[in-house]
């Protein structure tokens, strides 16, 4: 049976809230999914999942240090995530604060790892982005991303 994980780093709670919404949507869509803060996850854990979703606040247009550390740890496990489904999301303090570049940085690492990334033709093309606390629009984008990740994962790993 396919399974997923949503991994996040959050200081203010905004990224955590987004992670919980995405994980719930994945579970509700029939993909058994765990939601864990990044300090409870090691790179060795990730190959056991068929879908890996990573969330980070935006710091200077980049992923937070703990998220970058996890991504860097994947180098020694190169190929172990090949063919798995990947997705990313981010929160920031300001409009234009760099959330898209944060998400793209995570997605770039996933692509190098051989992961399957699905864009979205509606709304959050690269992944859900929040400015501050997630509002209703962001909550809907998180739900949609979780549903789409679950659907793709179940198709690839029946």
Predicted feature residues:
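FMN-binding flavodoxin-like domain, especially the glycine-rich phosphate-binding loop
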Residues: 2-4, 10, 14-158
